[in-house]
């Protein structure tokens, strides 16, 4: 009746609706941009930003961001040795020892005041006999380096006074590599390596090259975020360093989203990733959720 087949007509209608939708989106974008200084649009933006941040699981809330859940889901694996680099006051180490009853933890904390608080936190703990404290840092090369402690924010210890407006206390830190440490201790394999060192995670991994190339580390957790801008070691670089041997995924409260690298994930939002040896599909299944 109208000079076209039913399928062709449906296609034309669909294309028309799509074009209309695109024009509508363009109009809405323009309206938002023109009124971006208004109170209503500002409130909507803050609400949307909060939603997006939550959707990306941004933040370091150990109890709720999925880090504790990772430990719990790995309980059946009966892990025996974990390395906690950047232990702070021991939240992760305590969680690992509680979830893995046969595991020992080596906890590294380079800041002297934080190291004291870490040791004190375990003095009367029932898991005290399974944790060993090390007042030194791990990096890509051994030696001494000036680092900075922030008394009001002890989790921010790093090798540069990057946080403007915060009091920074310089101190001399002794560093070694994970390869050297394990060689000295006769440690042949690591079940779980957790790294949270304010943007220097890649240095720790480079100092473990021997262990990595020998497939001696089953799982790795590292933090990624805005400090990658300063270090210029991007999420892309972590995938290039690790993806030959590991499957890599972002940690969420109820699952790990394993997958390949995509430039849209290079968002510099503070979050945690976990890597599992490709030859350990059992651990991968536990974590997928």
For the regions a language model picked out, list residue spans one by one:
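Phosphate/nucleotide-binding beta-alpha loop and adjacent structural elements of enzyme active sites
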Residues: 2-289
């Amino acid at each position: 009746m109208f000079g076209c087949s039913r399928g062709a007509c449906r296609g034309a209608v669909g294309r028309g609706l799509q074009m209309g939708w695109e024009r509508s989106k363009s109009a809405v974008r323009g309206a938002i941009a023109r009124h971006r200084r208004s109170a209503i649009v500002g409130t909507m933006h803050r609400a949307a930003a909060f939603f997006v941040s939550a959707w990306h699981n941004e933040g370091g809330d150990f109890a709720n961001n999925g880090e504790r859940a990772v430990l719990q889901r790995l309980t059946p694996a009966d892990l025996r040795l974990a390395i906690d680099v950047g232990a702070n006051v021991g939240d992760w180490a305590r969680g690992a020892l509680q979830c893995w009853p046969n595991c020992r933890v080596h906890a590294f904390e380079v800041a002297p005041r934080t190291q004291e608080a870490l040791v004190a936190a375990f003095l009367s703990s029932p898991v005290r006999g399974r944790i060993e404290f090390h007042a030194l840092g791990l990096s890509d090369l051994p030696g001494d380096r000036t680092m900075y402690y922030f008394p009001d924010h002890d989790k921010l210890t790093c090798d540069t006074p990057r946080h403007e407006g915060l009091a920074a206390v310089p101190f001399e830190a002794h560093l070694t590599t994970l390869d050297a440490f394990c060689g000295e201790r006769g440690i042949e394999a690591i079940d779980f390596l957790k790294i949270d060192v304010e943007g220097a995670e890649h240095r720790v991994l480079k100092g473990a090259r021997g262990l990595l190339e020998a497939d001696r580390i089953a799982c790795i957790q590292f933090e990624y975020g805005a400090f990658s801008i300063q270090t210029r070691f991007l999420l892309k670089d972590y995938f290039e360093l690790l993806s030959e041997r590991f499957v890599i995924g972002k940690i969420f409260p109820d699952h790990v989203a394993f997958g390949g690298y995509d430039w849209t994930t290079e968002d510099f939002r503070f979050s945690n990733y976990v890597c599992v040896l490709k030859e350990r599909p059992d651990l991968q299944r536990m974590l997928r959720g």
